[in-house]
Regions:
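Conserved catalytic core of the tyrosine transesterase superfamily
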Residues: 1-304
Length: 304
């Protein structure tokens, strides 16, 4: 079976991250059912039962990997497979979005005020300008951290203040930039111009956000999501915000919340956030304040 699994994974036109997840799922499948197990409904059910202690999201990834493998091998009775999937699937309950808005806004305010001293070293000045531009980009565009770190300078249409990106699910989308995020990016890139003459990479192909640590020296090297999150957490400490109070995805939550509060239009927020389903955006509806106002009218104002 392992030979077939390797053949299956080699044919997949998916991201490296997805292939890694599928490989892990299929290795777990082999460990559970055995390398010589027949690819039938009974084997599939045995695997589903073994997943009961895992989270709904993990179960979904594992099921998808195994079902695609069955399809690749042209194995299994598909009506029975569908019925077994429905019977043994643990449904995940809907969760509303909850984040510490006050802490996020404190981090945003601190990063927006970053203005390095002229006497600071070049790397420190560039790091401060980069971190300011990065945080403002996250909160004003709704980009995921991986999407922001993947941006190239040539991706930005500076006149229209937008970029066309390849986002989640390998889908192309238009992302709009605010005036302040564009200004912060331009200030950062202008300061970085003293480094770029040493680069052999064409300007349009250079990363929008780069490393400026000692190991990077004066070369233009892209910064990873992990490296950028580490930098933001350091800014959180400087802003006296507990690192556990803000998660990296909270900046995206903040973006969606602000768009909904400003317009009260879930469909518009869905489009700007690039959510595939309106049900995802609907998790932010409790921020609208209508229920709060009604509750206050019923239980508080009558007591005054």
């Amino acid at each position: 079976m392992e030979t077939e699994i390797n053949r299956f994974l080699e044919t997949l036109d998916r991201s490296a991250k997805t292939i890694f997840a599928y490989r892990h799922a299929l290795l777990q499948f082999v460990r559970t059912v055995g390398n010589n197990a027949p690819l039938n409904t009974e084997t599939y059910v045995k695997f589903l039962i073994s997943l009961r202690q895992k989270s709904p999201s993990t179960q979904r990834v594992y099921r998808t990997a195994v079902r695609k493998f069955y399809a690749f091998c042209k194995a299994g009775n598909w009506p029975e497979i569908e019925e077994a999937t429905d019977h043994y699937t643990r449904k995940a309950g809907k969760r509303i979005v909850n984040f510490n808005r006050e802490a996020v806004e404190k981090v945003i305010s601190y990063c927006e005020s970053l203005n390095p001293e002229p006497s600071a070293s070049l790397s420190k000045r560039l790091e401060a300008l980069r971190d300011r531009a990065f945080v403002l980009t996250l909160v004003d565009t709704g980009l995921r951290i991986s999407e922001a770190c993947s941006l190239k300078r040539g991706d930005i249409d500076w006149l229209e203040q937008r970029a066309i990106i390849i986002g989640k699910g390998d889908k192309q989308a238009v992302v709009r930039f605010s005036n302040r995020s564009i200004q912060a990016l331009q200030a950062y890139l202008h300061a970085r111009s003293v480094v770029e003459p040493n680069s052999r990479i064409p300007l349009s192909s250079q990363p929008l956000f780069a490393r400026h640590d000692i190991r990077a020296s004066k070369k233009i090297r892209p910064i990873t999501s992990g490296g950028m999150w580490k930098a933001i957490k350091a800014r959180m400490t400087e802003a006296n915000v507990d690192r556990h109070m803000v998660r990296i995805h909270d900046f995206r939550h903040y973006f969606v919340t602000m768009t909904y509060l400003a317009k009260g239009n879930l469909k518009l927020s869905q489009e700007l956030a690039r959510h595939e389903s309106i049900s995802t955006t609907n998790r932010y509806a409790h921020f609208g304040g209508e229920a709060d106002a009604a509750y206050d009218e019923i239980f508080n104002k009558r007591q005054k």
